[in-house]
Curated annotation (Swiss-Prot):
<comment type="similarity">
    <text>Belongs to the glutamyl-tRNA reductase family.</text>
</comment>
<dbReference type="InterPro" id="IPR006151">
    <property type="entry name" value="Shikm_DH/Glu-tRNA_Rdtase"/>
</dbReference>
<dbReference type="InterPro" id="IPR036453">
    <property type="entry name" value="GluRdtase_dimer_dom_sf"/>
</dbReference>
<keyword id="KW-0560">Oxidoreductase</keyword>
<feature type="binding site">
    <location>
        <position position="108"/>
    </location>
    <ligand>
        <name>substrate</name>
    </ligand>
</feature>
<protein>
    <recommendedName>
        <fullName>Glutamyl-tRNA reductase</fullName>
        <ecNumber>1.2.1.70</ecNumber>
    </recommendedName>
</protein>
<feature type="binding site">
    <location>
        <begin position="188"/>
        <end position="193"/>
    </location>
    <ligand>
        <name>NADP(+)</name>
    </ligand>
</feature>
<feature type="binding site">
    <location>
        <position position="119"/>
    </location>
    <ligand>
        <name>substrate</name>
    </ligand>
</feature>
<dbReference type="InterPro" id="IPR015896">
    <property type="entry name" value="4pyrrol_synth_GluRdtase_dimer"/>
</dbReference>
<dbReference type="Pfam" id="PF05201">
    <property type="entry name" value="GlutR_N"/>
</dbReference>
<dbReference type="GO" id="GO:0050661">
    <property type="term" value="F:NADP binding"/>
</dbReference>
<dbReference type="InterPro" id="IPR036291">
    <property type="entry name" value="NAD(P)-bd_dom_sf"/>
</dbReference>
<feature type="site" description="Important for activity">
    <location>
        <position position="98"/>
    </location>
</feature>
<dbReference type="InterPro" id="IPR036343">
    <property type="entry name" value="GluRdtase_N_sf"/>
</dbReference>
<comment type="pathway">
    <text>Porphyrin-containing compound metabolism; protoporphyrin-IX biosynthesis; 5-aminolevulinate from L-glutamyl-tRNA(Glu): step 1/2.</text>
</comment>
<feature type="binding site">
    <location>
        <begin position="49"/>
        <end position="52"/>
    </location>
    <ligand>
        <name>substrate</name>
    </ligand>
</feature>
<dbReference type="InterPro" id="IPR000343">
    <property type="entry name" value="4pyrrol_synth_GluRdtase"/>
</dbReference>
């Protein structure tokens, strides 16, 4: 058996090709059934995300990566010549190491991102549900999850914000001790604000107000995160309630001005307000930063935080890579020891079968009245010849082919050079 990974990802393939070989839930079910029933594949897991499609499998002896690549191309009706330039292949320890790097976020578009581990776990769960995993692959994925946990525990690779939305929420958490006690006003209802709302919700934010030009779009966020919805003209009325204001609209002019904030601060009795403006052009007048108790951060401020955090993640990645190298080597040691156990068991079974076969013939000879000494001598001769037959042939072949190292190994194995 051999461990194998074949796949494409965001660095090797275009979005168009990644879409063509992605596995929808319906396709995944069919694909896992095909893998399970294949004569060439012992066990397999399919990982399919927007950034990668990968097949992790244990293939039977003599099966090459070409078999799995051909299967992938045929399954998705993609020409092999279209697929091949974007395919990468990892075997044995390289396959183990690749899976661990993927799960730890070391191979992600955003270095250290944690979402990929959940996607790997789901891919494994789907394969188990379809009885497509067993043996080495099952052990590999279980070990992989332990390694990912170790990397998250022993390094800070996922602890620094590297997206604008996440950086905005991280900033809010740093300034306000508990988001569960803070009111957040989100201005806008686009994709970035939706991500901000999700991060805030994950951080325990309980009071959320969404202000948007159209209420319909904002209502979707409100239902998802139990938020209050207001229109843009209603912002001055609700601004004094907000401790944190995060804004991202496509407005050509500022929505929140210095005077509006000044009035809100008076009504709040100058309790601090955090303004995070991630819009371009800006939604919040720059003069707001001149006010006492108003703290304004722009998208440029966040970008400098993100750039710093990316560098920090790169430093943490060095330690993470070392952990992955160590753990992948340990897993291969386990595989080799397992292979040795299987070989020893098979050798013992074969030897025992020889012994029983010859013993039965000898017992029959004794029962028929043959000379016991002659029967025992014949038994010992035949048993010796059968046991030395395979190593004798191997030594003859090695000598004939000039394979000195192989001959030395055989001699050591059978105790001639001990």
């Amino acid at each position: 058996m051999s461990l194998l990974v074949i796949g494409i990802n965001h660095t090797s393939a275009s979005v168009d090709l990644r879409e063509k070989v992605a596995f929808s839930p319906e396709k995944l079910t069919k694909a896992l059934d095909e893998l399970k029933n294949s004569d060439a594949i012992q066990s397999g897991v399919i990982l399919s995300t927007c950034n990668r499609t990968e097949i992790y499998c244990e293939v039977k002896h003599g099966i090459s990566s070409g078999y799995v690549i051909n299967w992938l191309a045929e399954f998705h009706h993609v020409a092999l010549e279209t697929l091949m330039p974007s395919i990468y292949i990892h075997e044995e320890q390289a396959a183990v190491k690749h899976l661990m790097r993927v799960s730890c976020g070391l191979d992600s578009l955003v270095l250290g991102e944690p979402q990929i581990l959940g996607q790997v776990k789901k891919a494994f769960a789907d394969a188990r549900e379809h009885n497509a995993v067993e043996g080495t692959i099952e052990k590999l994925f279980q070990q992989d999850f332990s390694v990912a946990k170790r990397v998250r525990t022993e390094t800070n690779i996922g602890g620094n914000a590297v997206s604008v939305a996440y950086a905005a929420c991280t900033l809010a958490r740093q300034i306000f001790e508990s988001l569960s006690d803070s009111t957040v006003l989100l201005v806008g209802a686009g994709e970035t604000i939706e991500l901000v709302a999700k991060h805030l919700d994950d951080s325990g934010c309980k009071r959320l107000i969404v202000a948007n030009r159209t209420r319909e779009r904002a209502m979707g966020l409100a239902e998802q995160f139990n938020a209050e919805v207001i229109s843009l003209p209603e912002i001055p009325e609700h601004l004094p309630k907000a401790d944190i204001i995060i804004s991202s609209t496509a407005s050509p002019l500022p929505i929140i001005g210095k005077g509006m904030v000044e009035s809100a601060l008076k009504l709040r009795k100058h309790q601090p307000m955090l303004f995070v403006d991630i819009a371009v052009p800006r939604d919040i007048e720059g003069e707001v930063a001149e006010l006492n108790d108003a703290y304004l951060y722009s998208v440029d401020d966040l970008q400098s935080i993100i750039d710093h955090n990316i560098e920090q993640r790169k430093i943490e990645a060095i330690q993470a890579e070392a952990i992955v190298s160590e753990e992948s080597a340990e897993f291969m040691t386990w595989i080799r020891s397992r292979q040795a156990v299987n070989s020893i068991r098979q050798y013992r079974e074969n030897s025992e079968a020889m012994r029983i076969e010859l013993l039965q013939k000898s017992m029959q000879a004794l029962a028929s009245g043959q000379n016991p000494e002659k029967v025992l001598a014949e038994l010992s001769n035949k048993l010796t010849n059968k046991l030395i037959h395979a190593p004798t042939l191997a030594m003859q072949q090695a000598a004939k082919n000039g394979e000195t190292e192989k001959l030395t190994v055989i001699r050591t194995t059978i105790g001639l050079d001990n």
